Amino acid sequence: MTPKTKTKTKTKTKTKTQMKMKLAAITLDCPDPPALAEFYQQATGFEPHPKSDAEFAALNREDGLLLGFQRVDDYRAPQWPDQTVPQQAHMCFDVPDLDEAEARLLELGAGKPDHQPHDPTRARVLTDPAGHPFCICRRG
């Protein structure tokens, strides 16, 4: 009698390489691109894009992300949390100190809606001068 041997068959599964996208830009509609760019430049420290103008202004982050602001005729600010004019998108920024960041942003021209859906020790909702809501969140 000969011993039975198991034959192992290697099966190669071909996996399709998934295309990975890198976020290159975030652009917000607004009535005054240079003014909104100035607000976010002071808030974030991002560098102004050299080709900014009255129709489209932008800021560059060190890693290449562009934060853009495009002029829209008859712009209507989001009415958050009301959905009459929905927000459509919002950004979140990590900050080391919520109270300090909030005070600074309000001084720069941000607004603070009455409706605050988060634990105020973790995150707060503010609005930029064009009415876009954004969050500041405590790191960690």
Question: What is the meaning of each model-derived region?
Answer:
Residues 1-10, 14-38, 42, 88-93, ...:
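N-terminal beta-strand motif that seeds the catalytic metal site of vicinal oxygen chelate
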Residues 69-71:
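A short, structured beta-strand/loop element
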Residues 73-77:
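Short amphipathic beta-strand starts and helix->beta connectors
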Residues 41-43, 80-84, 106, 126, ...:
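Surface-exposed beta-strand edges and their flanking turn/coil or helix-capping segments
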Residues 32-47, 101, 105-108:
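Amphipathic alpha-helical segments
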Residues 2-4, 18-21, 23-31, 49-51, 60-61, 65, 79-100, ...:
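Vicinal oxygen chelate
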